[in-house]
C-alpha cells in the first residue's frame, strides 16, 4: 500500500504539467450536466465525495496496485477490468483506452463510471466512497455550487 502511494505521487509529479485538478463546484456542474445526479439512486453528493477521496479531483491521478494493474483518473478506474492499457489481457469492459481516463475531458471517465455503477455493486466499487461517503449526509458537497 505504501508503495502504491509513492508511485501515485511519482505519477502526479511526472504528469503534473498536464494535470488538471478540478474544484468541487466545477465538478458538481460537470457531473450534473452529465446526468450523474441520482444516477442509479446516487445523489450528486455521492459522486463529488467519491471523486475527492479517490483522486483529490485530479484528472491524471494514477495508482499502481500490488497486482500490477493501475487505477486511472478522477474516478480511479482499474486497468485490469475496465480499460485497455496495452498488450496485457485486460477485460476492458468500458471499451476505452486507459489513457482516455486521464484527460481533462471527463466524458469517457463518466461513461465508464456509470457502467461500473450499473454493472457491479453500485458505488461499492470505490473504497474511498465506502469509507468516507456511504450512508452520510452529503448535501454539503454541492453547497454553494449553483447546481440544483
From Swiss-Prot:
Which SUPFAM superfamilies is this protein grouped with? Lysozyme-like
Which superkingdom, per the lineage? Eukaryota
Residues of the active site are 54, 71
What's its EC? 3.2.1.17
Answer yes or no on keyword Disulfide bond: yes
Q: What is its main location?
A: secreted
Q: Which residues are glycosylated?
A: 58
One GO term in the molecular function aspect is: lysozyme activity
Enumerate the transmembrane spans: none
Q: Do you know which PROSITE patterns this protein is assigned to?
A: GLYCOSYL_HYDROL_F22_1 (PS00128), GLYCOSYL_HYDROL_F22_2 (PS51348)
Q: What is the disulfide pattern of this chain?
A: 25-145, 49-133, 83-98, 94-112
Q: Which UniProt keywords apply?
A: Disulfide bond, Glycoprotein, Glycosidase, Hydrolase, Secreted, Signal
Q: Outline the extent of the C-type lysozyme domain.
A: 20-148
GO terms for cellular component: extracellular region
Subunit structure, interactors included: Monomer.
Instruction: Give the similarity note.
Output: Belongs to the glycosyl hydrolase 22 family.
PANTHER family hit by this protein: LYSOZYME C, LYSOZYME-LIKE PROTEIN 1-RELATED
Protein name per its UniProtKB record = Lysozyme-like protein 2
Source organism of this protein record: Homo sapiens
* Gene symbol of the encoding locus: LYZL2
Amino acid at each position: 500500500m505504501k508503495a502504491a502511494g509513492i508511485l501515485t505521487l511519482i505519477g502526479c509529479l511526472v504528469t503534473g504539467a498536464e494535470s488538471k485538478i478540478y474544484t468541487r463546484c466545477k465538478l458538481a456542474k460537470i457531473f450534473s450536466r452529465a446526468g450523474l445526479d441520482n444516477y442509479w439512486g446516487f445523489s450528486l453528493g455521492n459522486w463529488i465525495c467519491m471523486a475527492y477521496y479517490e483522486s483529490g479531483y485530479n484528472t491524471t491521478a494514477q495508482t499502481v496496485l500490488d497486482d500490477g494493474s493501475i487505477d486511472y483518473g478522477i474516478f480511479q478506474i482499474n486497468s485490469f477490468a475496465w480499460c485497455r492499457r496495452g498488450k496485457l489481457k485486460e477485460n476492458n469492459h468500458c471499451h476505452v483506452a486507459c489513457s482516455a481516463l486521464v484527460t481533462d475531458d471527463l466524458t469517457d471517465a463518466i461513461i465508464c463510471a456509470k457502467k461500473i455503477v450499473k454493472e457491479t455493486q453500485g458505488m461499492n466499487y470505490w473504497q474511498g466512497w465506502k469509507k468516507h461517503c456511504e450512508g452520510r449526509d452529503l448535501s454539503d458537497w454541492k453547497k454553494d455550487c449553483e447546481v440544483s
